[in-house]
Curated annotation (Swiss-Prot):
EC number assigned by the record: 6.3.4.4
Protein name listed in UniProt: Adenylosuccinate synthetase
The keyword Metal-binding is annotated on this UniProt entry: yes
Record flagged with keyword Chaperone: no
Recorded coiled-coil stretches: none
Amino acids binding substrate: 301-307
Pathway terms, separated by semicolons: Purine metabolism; AMP biosynthesis via de novo pathway; AMP from IMP: step 1/2
Positions with a binding annotation for Mg(2+): 13, 40
Residues at the catalytic site: 13 (proton acceptor), 41 (proton donor)
Described function: Plays an important role in the de novo pathway of purine nucleotide biosynthesis. Catalyzes the first committed step in the biosynthesis of AMP from IMP.
Subcellular location: Cytoplasm
Cofactors: Mg(2+)
Family: Belongs to the adenylosuccinate synthetase family.
Length: 437
């Protein structure tokens, strides 16, 4: 039995969906442990494109069990839409294939309204770049102990009372502070009672089920969302998401004991991207950045927003090693760098003449950073058709090796394209457990 956590090591959009899909082959259980439908995992299987926002991508395998942990915040309407979309493509998501923690908090209509109203009220320089899906306000209610959980839908009287109190408070804020329309109690109540009827068979105790799976020697894969630098505590605050995206939250967000985790795989692009506002030391503003953007199809799966692009940031990578305890890398989009005569990698930062080897916590300092680059030779030939790692150009392998040496973490997986087949597994994290530096 092995338990493996997969996390994004940059600012999200690293290709976690594809890597999770690959590792699902070796898993019995696949678990989402944080975030909501603000994240999108895209994967291509047999030429067919799938985009998942809530359901773990392991649902594509009939013999696998998928779980949504207590750390996830759930929009029932979006979940049902995703299930309906899969059914149209011949895949019915049944309760024996998907379990939702009854401790997961629900995104309510007033959460998205508050999210959008608050973002609209901010000045351009202070906008976070939220997706407007109610993620932040839902987490605020959770921490404020006034949230509504999935299990509350099973008790009609309890749900009615909690909803009444919540709408009374939210309507005051919406109408008085933002001048926005009020939320109608009756329509929300009826809508969520309908959701309860459809989703209640899926509710259960994820923590207990995972412990039973562990004791039965099952392989468990924990699927993270977003990226390390978007972590609410360890990221470039306030330009972050509202949950902990680091590997430690795999345990808190699912009710799984930390001593049972065997390996942590960090997903990292061969270059760097970021969506929305916030510090980005290696960002490229010239034709090179535009080239990476176009060749890498850097547009968000959830929002369609154009991603900012830059060179590989070794400092960010080392931060991810430290914060997650990474045991291996999954390096994606190596193919996008084909054709570059030379490739840069940030090995440190300069802040007003001071050399830094970690992202500073002060946001003004983070925005003032200048990357200190080292340069390595690029390669001319396209690599998207290569299936054997040894067949890669020498320069491409040297680049991978430089990332391994710089971070002290080996590459488990190298990806050279979006399709499942365009992936090379150098070592299986379910079988090999190596310690980081």
């Amino acid at each position: 039995m092995s338990s493996v956590v997969v996390v994004g090591a940059q600012w999200g959009d690293e290709g976690k969906g594809k890597i999770v899909d690959l590792l699902t082959k070796y898993s019995d259980y696949i678990v989402r442990f944080q975030g909501g439908n603000n994240a999108g995992h895209t994967l291509v299987v047999d030429g067919k494109k799938f985009v998942f926002h809530i359901i773990p991508s392991g649902i594509l395998y009939e013999e696998k069990t998928c779980m949504i942990g207590n750390g996830v915040i759930l929009d029932p309407g979006v979940l049902l839409e995703e299930m309906a979309s899969l059914k149209e493509r011949g895949l019915e998501v049944k309760p024996n294939r998907l379990m939702i923690s009854d401790n997961a908090h629900l995104i309510m209509p007033y959460h998205s309204q508050l999210d959008q109203a608050k973002e609209s009220a901010l000045s351009a320089s202070n906008k976070i770049g939220t997706t407007g899906r109610g993620i932040g306000p839902c987490y605020m209610d959770k921490v404020g102990r006034v949230g509504i959980k999935a299990g509350d839908l099973l008790d009609e009287d309890l749900f009615r009372e909690k909803l009444r109190c919540a709408i009374e408070e939210k309507n005051f804020i919406l109408t008085k502070k933002f001048g926005a329309p009020a939320v109608d109690f009756d329509s929300v109540y009826r809508q969520f009672m309908d959701f309860a009827e459809q989703l209640s068979p899926y509710f259960g105790n994820v923590s207990v089920t995972l412990d039973e799976a562990r004791r039965a020697d099952k392989n468990i894969l924990f699927e993270g969302a977003q990226g390390t630098q978007l972590d609410i505590d360890h990221g470039t605050y306030p330009f972050v998401t509202s949950s902990n995206t680091v590997a430690g939250n795999a345990c808190a967000g699912s009710g799984f004991g930390p001593s049972h985790i065997d390996a942590v795989v960090g997903i990292v692009k061969a270059y760097t991207t970021r969506v929305g506002s916030g510090p980005f030391p290696t960002e490229l503003f010239d034709e090179k950045g535009e080239e990476l953007q176009n060749k890498g199809s850097e547009f968000g799966a959830t929002t369609g927003r154009r991603r900012r692009c830059g060179w590989f940031d070794g400092v960010v990578a080392n931060d991810a090693v430290r914060l997650n305890g990474l045991t291996g890398w999954a390096l994606t989009k190596l193919d996008v760098l084909s054709g570059q005569k030379s490739i840069k990698m940030a090995s440190s930062y300069d802040l007003n003449g001071k050399k830094l080897h970690a992202m500073p916590n002060n946001i003004k300092d983070a925005e003032a950073l200048k990357p200190v680059y080292e340069e390595v030779p690029g390669w001319a030939d396209e690599v998207d058709g290569i299936c054997n790692y040894d067949d890669l150009p020498t320069e491409a392998k040297d680049y991978v090796r430089r990332i391994e040496d710089f971070t002290g973490v080996p590459a488990n997986i190298v990806s050279v394209g979006p399709d499942r087949a365009q992936t090379m597994m150098l070592s299986n994290p379910f079988e090999t457990k190596k310690c980081c530096k």
